[in-house]
C-alpha cells in the first residue's frame, strides 16, 4: 500500500495522468497485474452513450483506450464527464486534459451523475443521464457507480480517481466493494475534516458557495452538497482496501484576496465570500488533506 500526499496545481491535469500511471505501476508491482488486466490481447472499442441500469434509469458513460486496467474518473460537485476532457486554459479543446492523456496508456471511463452540468460557450448543458430527485446523497451516488460499472461491462478491478465530491463517492464505493478496487487517487477530495477548522457560520458559507445559485448553474436539476449529509457518512465509512493510494492536493489557492475583492466588486462572488472566510477555508483544507492522507 502506498501513502502519499502530493502537491500540484488544481488544473495541471496532465499531472493527474502521470499519478494515475504511477498507481497502475505500483499495483502491478504488488502483483496485481493479472487481476487488474482484462483478457490478454483483447481490444476494446471507444464507447460513449447511455448505459441502462435496469431500474428505469440510464447513465451517460464514455470510455476510451483499449488495454490495461480501467481507470474510472469520478467528477466533482455538479461536473459532467466532459469536464475531464477540457482544461481551464482552453475549455473548447481536450488537448492536455486528463481523459485523453490517461487513454494514451490504459482504459479510462468517465460518466455524468444526474444533476451535473458543463459550461459551454452557449451556456450550461445539463447531465445526459436520467434525472433524479435532488438532493441525492453521496451513498446514492456510490450505489449508482456500482450499478453503472456492472451494467457497462467494463472489467475490474478499477483504479478510481475522485475529484472534490468525487472523493467521498470513491471512498464509499471502495469500502463496499474492496475486491473491485485496484488503486485510488484523490484529487482535492472533500473530507470529513474540512469543517474542523471552520466556525459554524463558515461551514454554512461553504455550503452556500457550492450551491447552484452561487455558481450560476441552472435551477431545478442541479447536484447539491450538504456537509451535514456527507460528513457523518465519511466518519463511519469502513477502511479502504489496502491498494496503492495517492492524495493529490493543490498548492495554490484560487480564491486569493485580490480575486475575492474583485469578484465581490463585480458581483461574480456573493457578499458572504470574504477574505477572512476564504483564508480560513484554505487553511482548513490543507490540514484536512493531511488527515485524509494519513488514513491510507
Model-predicted segments: where are they?
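Bacterial N-terminal signal peptides that target proteins for export
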Residues: 2-18
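C-terminal motif of bacterial Sec signal peptides marking the signal peptidase cleavage site
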Residues: 25-29
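Bacterial signal peptide processing site
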Residues: 31-34
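Conserved HGGG/HGGXW glycine-rich cap/lid loop of the alpha/beta-hydrolase fold
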Residues: 51-57, 62-121
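Conserved acidic catalytic loop of the alpha/beta-hydrolase fold
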Residues: 139-156
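Conserved hydrolase catalytic core segment
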Residues: 152-193
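Flexible "cap/lid" loop of the alpha/beta hydrolase fold
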Residues: 185-227
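Conserved serine/cysteine hydrolase catalytic core
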Residues: 212-296
Amino acid at each position: 500500500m502506498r501513502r502519499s500526499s502530493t502537491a500540484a496545481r488544481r488544473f495541471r491535469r496532465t499531472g493527474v495522468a502521470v499519478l494515475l500511471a504511477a498507481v497502475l505501476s505500483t499495483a502491478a508491482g504488488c502483483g496485481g497485474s493479472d487481476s487488474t488486466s482484462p483478457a490478454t490481447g483483447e481490444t476494446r472499442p471507444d464507447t460513449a452513450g447511455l448505459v441502462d441500469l435496469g431500474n428505469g434509469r440510464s447513465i451517460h458513460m464514455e470510455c476510451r483506450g483499449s488495454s490495461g486496467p480501467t481507470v474510472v474518473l469520478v467528477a466533482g460537485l455538479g461536473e459532467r464527464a466532459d469536464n475531464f476532457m477540457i482544461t481551464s486554459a482552453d475549455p473548447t479543446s481536450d488537448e492536455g486534459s486528463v481523459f485523453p492523456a490517461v487513454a494514451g496508456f490504459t482504459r479510462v471511463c468517465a460518466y455524468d451523475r444526474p444533476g451535473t452540468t458543463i459550461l459551454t460557450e452557449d451556456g450550461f448543458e445539463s447531465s445526459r443521464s436520467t434525472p433524479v430527485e435532488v438532493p441525492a446523497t453521496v451513498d446514492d451516488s456510490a450505489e449508482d457507480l456500482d450499478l453503472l460499472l456492472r451494467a457497462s461491462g467494463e472489467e475490474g478491478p478499477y483504479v478510481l480517481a475522485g475529484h472534490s465530491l468525487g472523493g467521498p463517492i470513491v471512498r464509499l464505493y471502495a469500502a463496499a466493494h474492496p475486491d473491485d478496487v485496484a488503486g485510488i487517487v484523490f484529487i482535492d477530495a472533500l473530507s470529513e475534516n474540512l469543517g474542523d477548522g471552520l466556525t459554524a457560520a463558515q461551514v454554512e458559507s461553504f455550503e452556500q458557495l457550492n450551491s447552484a445559485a452561487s455558481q450560476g448553474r441552472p435551477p431545478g436539476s442541479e447536484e447539491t452538497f450538504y456537509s451535514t449529509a456527507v460528513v457523518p457518512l465519511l466518519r463511519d465509512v469502513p477502511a479502504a482496501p489496502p491498494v496503492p493510494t495517492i492524495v493529490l492536493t493543490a498548492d495554490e489557492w484560487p480564491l486569493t484576496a485580490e480575486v475575492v475583492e474583485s469578484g465581490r466588486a463585480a458581483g461574480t462572488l456573493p457578499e458572504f465570500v470574504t477574505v477572512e472566510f476564504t483564508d480560513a477555508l484554505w487553511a482548513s483544507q490543507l490540514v484536512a488533506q493531511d488527515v485524509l492522507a494519513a488514513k491510507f
